[in-house]
UniProtKB/Swiss-Prot annotation:
EC number: 2.5.1.55
Subcellular location: Cytoplasm
Molecular-function GO terms, alphabetical: 3-deoxy-8-phosphooctulonate synthase activity
Listed name of the protein: 2-dehydro-3-deoxyphosphooctonate aldolase
Keywords annotated in UniProt: Cytoplasm, Lipopolysaccharide biosynthesis, Transferase
GO biological process: keto-3-deoxy-D-manno-octulosonic acid biosynthetic process; monosaccharide biosynthetic process
Organism name: Chlamydia trachomatis serovar D (strain ATCC VR-885 / DSM 19411 / UW-3/Cx)
Entry keyword annotation includes Oxidoreductase: no
Length: 269
């Protein structure tokens, strides 16, 4: 699906807020451009955040307008697109525009959603639920494979640890790798403190650098990073998104470490 010698970088804002998403996408392309030989960038954003903590929180522009926006970004920037879906009907519509459709962590056991996502023949990114062990991902994988679609990505995004907390177990990455599909580490949702702010999730972005480096060292194919020009003003996941400025600062180390691990793996084979 992707060049194995390139680090996947699935990056973009949590949700489409307004037309500023175009400028964010353009800026991301500029940031990644110097690393074109080492990084495979995929733009991500959501048209609907269907699992917000509060009914009063912003969800997004909706399916129709959101997919229109993503289609324009895809055409203008010549970039692959990922978005998340929440029902079989949404999966069918999103696959008409997006190269990758994502099954959210909370929905990763929903059989109808997984099967329909597979039937679209798009690449399917399955996010491991916070409530699942890595071994239990065999079930979601089998549901997609039952459609004849083997284009699967597995994303680790942390595991529930008591109330309002997540931990990242790097052993999970090795377990997921053994399924034989590309494994991605979600460096921003992994630092969330779910429900810690009552009507929304908190976050500890200061741990993004160490967790992303650890995941690369553990052997992931890429990183999933939600990013925003000014996270503090973001309409969703403000407490856990990485600023574009910080992404630009961290990217060189990610690429260097990924390249080193690839070289070490080649020697050890």
């Amino acid at each position: 699906m992707f060049p194995e010698n390139k680090m996947l970088l699935i990056a973009g804002p949590c949700v489409i807020e307004d037309n500023s998403v175009f400028e964010t996408a353009r800026r991301l392309k500029e940031i990644v451009a110097p690393y074109a030989s080492s990084v495979h960038w995929i733009f991500k954003s959501s048209y609907d955040k269907a699992n917000r903590s509060s009914v009063h929180n912003y969800r997004g522009p909706g399916l129709k307008l959101g997919l229109q926006t993503l289609a324009k970004i895809k055409e203008e920037l010549d970039v692959e697109i990922l978005t998340d879906v929440h029902s079989p009907d949404e999966a069918r519509e999103a696959a008409k525009v997006c190269d990758i459709i994502q099954v959210p962590a909370f929905l990763c056991r929903q059989t109808d959603l997984l099967v329909t996502a597979g039937e679209t023949q798009a690449i399917v990114n399955i996010k491991k639920g916070q409530f699942l062990s890595p071994w239990e991902m065999q079930g979601p994988i089998d549901k997609v494979l039952s459609t004849g679609n083997n284009k699967i990505i597995l994303t680790e995004r942390g595991c529930s640890f008591g109330y309002n907390n997540l931990v990242s177990d790097m052993r999970s990455i090795e377990v997921l790798r053994r399924f034989g599909f590309p494994v991605v580490f979600d460096g921003t949702h992994s630092v969330q403190l779910p429900g810690a702010l009552h009507s929304q999730s908190g976050g500890q972005t200061e741990f993004i650098p160490v967790l992303t480096r650890s995941a690369i060292a553990a052997g992931v194919q890429g990183l999933f990073i939600e990013t925003h020009p000014n996270p503090s003003s973001a309409l969703s996941d403000a407490a856990s998104m990485l600023s574009l400025k910080d992404l630009e600062r961290l990217l060189p180390a990610w690429v260097q470490l990924f390249t080193y691990i690839q070289e070490m793996d080649a020697v050890s084979v």
